Amino acid sequence: MNSHRWRRDFSIAEKTGLVALLLALLLGFFATPHTAALPLVLFVVVCLVAPFLPQWSFFLPVICRKKKGTSGIALTFDDGPFPGSTPLLLELLAKYKLPATFFVIGKNAAAHPELIDAILAHGHTIGNHSYRHDNLLSLRSYRTIEQDIQETQDILGRAGICPLVFRPPIGITSPRLQPVLAHLGLQTITFSCRTFDRGNRDVRDLASRVLKQLRHGDILLLHDNPPLNDDAKIDWSNELHRLFASLHQSDRVVPLATLIDHPVMAFLDK
């Protein structure tokens, strides 16, 4: 598959590394060896921190919010589908006429193909969120990363779609992710607004927490995980009602593809 059109020849990490090396050589020539090592040490520190900054395009191009000139916000839901949460979520989205993108986990999609069909039947789009949600997937070997992501692509292909976007588990990136996604034709999508709901384990005041920080252009990260018990599920439903009602009234929600000016998935010929 052809590389994605947003793929850059040299990442920020590669350019920064080259600059650090040149500075080290210059300082080594004009200053002390200890001084010369500073740019390289700083570069290593940045490389260690960068994987955990999901909004930074350090190792590869990352889209975390709108392109310039685009208004609105996009709703995204991670980790599903689940019988205990996805149908309710679809019902509420339909009630308030809100479009969403579901970044699904491959093993969940394989276990519940009827929910994938339901998501599509409601007019929503689907992205790849890895097969097992290994939090450190992006730090694994090239082979492991590609097998994991490709397995999810294959599962969703059986539903008649080909996702064109990938969200790494918990937003962790690495230089190993770039060539894999380029080969598979996937664009990395992260987020610019989140509530730290811990996969719907903490839904207290979810609506107010979102609305206080939500801005035009945001990609909002929420979760499609079933809450811990029936009482928590009722709380989650009530919070979603409040959030979706406010978003519907403000007419702020647009499809993710519209926000980023890039397709999220393609339908396969059957």
Region roles according to the model:
Residues 23-27, 44, 128-130, 189-192, ...:
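Short beta-strands and strand-loop turn motifs
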Residues 77-79, 104-106, 128-130, 167-170, ...:
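A cross-domain feature marking catalytic cores of carbohydrate-active enzymes
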Residues 90-104, 124-125, 141-172, 179-182, ...:
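CE4/NodB-like, metal-dependent polysaccharide N-deacetylase domain
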Residues 133-140, 228-231:
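A short acidic, helix-capping loop that chelates divalent metal ions and anchors anionic groups
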Residues 210-260:
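Catalytic grooves of carbohydrate-active enzymes
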